[in-house]
Amino acid sequence: MKLSPTLGQHPSHLVKAIMILLISFGSVGVVGGSFFLKKAVSSSNQPEIITDTSRYKEIRHQLWFSQDEIKHFPTEISVGVENVRLAYSPGVSQTGSYFQIRLKKSPQQIQQLLTQYRKQARHKYRGGDTNVHANLPNGVPTTFFYTGETTESFPPSYEILVLNAEDKGRPGFKWNHGDSYGVAIDSSASEIIYWAEKW
C-alpha cells in the first residue's frame, strides 16, 4: 500500500518560502524593536536642560521643588534686562538638578547686591567650581558655570557667595547628597548669577 504525499510529510516550496519570509520579518521586528527601545531608554536618561529665558517664571514658581533654595532669586525678570542667560535641569535618576539665571545690572546695583550677599554668605570663594570649592579645607559644594559661554569653571573675577549648603549624605559619604545655593557676582562685568543645586 502506497501513501499519498501530504503537506505534513513533504512541505511544498510555497510553504517553505512563507516560513522563510515570516522568520525574516520576525528577525527584523526584533532588531528594529530593540533599537527603538534602546533609544527610548537612553534618551530618558539624559537630563533635559532648559535655556529658554521665557520659561523663567514657570521654573521659578512651579518647577523648582524647594522654594527656600531660590527665595533669593528675582521673582521675575524685569523688561529691558540685557544679556539674560538661563540654565535649568530637573535632573533624572542619579543626576542632580540645578537652576541658574545670569543677569547684567548697573554697577550701583551690583555693589548693593555684593554688600547684601557678602553679609549673608556662609562661605566665600573666588572663581573655580563645585569640585574646587568642595575640596578646599572646610569647603562645600557650590555650582558649575552653567550659564557661561566656554567653561564650567568661574573665572577669578567672580565672587561665589554660598548662602547655604546642606550635607544630606550618610556617614562616610560626605556630600553624597545635599543642596547648596547662593550667588556669583562679577563686579567688573556688572553681572550676577543666582544659583541653586540639588544632588
What is each model feature region?
Residues T75-G80, R85-L161:
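Mature extracytoplasmic domains of secretory-pathway proteins
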Residues M1, V81, I101-L103, V183, ...:
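Generic structural hydrophobic/aromatic packing signal, biased to beta-strands
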Residues K2-V30, S34:
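N-terminal Sec-pathway targeting helices
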Residues V30-Q109:
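N-terminal export/targeting and maturation segments
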Residues S24-G26, S34-E48, Q120-V132:
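Short N-terminal helix-initiation segments at or just after the protein's N-terminus
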